Amino acid sequence: MPFFPRKVLLLTECSLATLCFLVLAAMAWGQAADKTSPAPLSAAQIVDLMQRHNQARADNLKHYHSLRLYEVQYKGFPALAAKITVEADYDSAIGKSFRIVSQSGSKLLVDKVLKRLLETEREAGKDQKSTALTSANYTFRLDGTENMAGRPAYVLDVEPLVKSKLLYRGKIWVDAHDFAVAKIEAQPAQNPSFWISKTQIHHEYVKTDAFWLPQKNRSETKVRLGGTAVLTIDYGTYQVVPAAVVPEGGF
C-alpha cells in the first residue's frame, strides 16, 4: 500500500464533512418562465413563495433516475484522483438509493470520500428539515435581480441561523417564475476542520419537466498544510415520474 501523508488522510475526512451538504443544500423543483423583469417582491415574499413551491414540487415528485459521475482530485503531494459512476434513484416512499457502476483511481479517495458521500446523502435524505433552505434555518436579504439563460431570477444573500457544517452562507439565485433555486454560490457556515483554510461551492440546478433537480456541482477545498481538493459532480440526465398530473401552470 502506498504511503499517504497525514495531510492527505486529514483531507479525506475534512472533505467529507464539507461536502455533506452538497446534495442537501436544496431540493428545489418548479415550472416555466419568461424573459421579463421579475415582479418587485420583498425578500420575505420571495422566500415564502419559494418554500410553498418547493413543498408542492416535493410532494408531487414520485421517482427519478439518473446516471451520475463523481470525480475528486487532490492537487498536492502526492497528487491523487478518483472517480465513480453511479446509478441514482429516488422514490418518494423509500428515499434515495445508489449503485456504483464503475470506479477508478485512488482507492483511498473512492472509499473515504466518494463512497462516504453517497452514504451521507442517503442518510441525510431522511431528515431534511434541519438542512432545508427555509426561514427556520436561514435569514435572507434581497441583493437584486439577474437573468440566467434568459430566465429572470432574484439574487438573495443567505446567512445560517446557527453554525453548522451542513448549512452554508453565500448567495442563491431563485427563478422568478418557478420560485425554485437555480444556483448556489456559498461556503460552509462552519469550518469542518482546522486543517481546512477555505471551501468554495458552486451548485447549479436544471429544470426537468415540472421539477428542478441538481445539475452539476464543483467544490474546491484548500488545505492549510498545502494542496487543494476539487470535487465535481455531474448529475446526468433525469428520468422523472410525477406523483400526479402536473397542473398546466406548474406548481
Task: Place the predicted regions along the sequence by residue.
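Bacterial N-terminal signal peptides
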Residues: 13-26
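Intrinsically disordered, low-complexity and often Lys/Arg-enriched segments
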Residues: 2-4, 30-33
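Structured extracytoplasmic
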Residues: 31-169, 176-181, 189-199, 206-213, ...
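N-terminal secretory signal peptides that target proteins for export/translocation
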Residues: 1-12
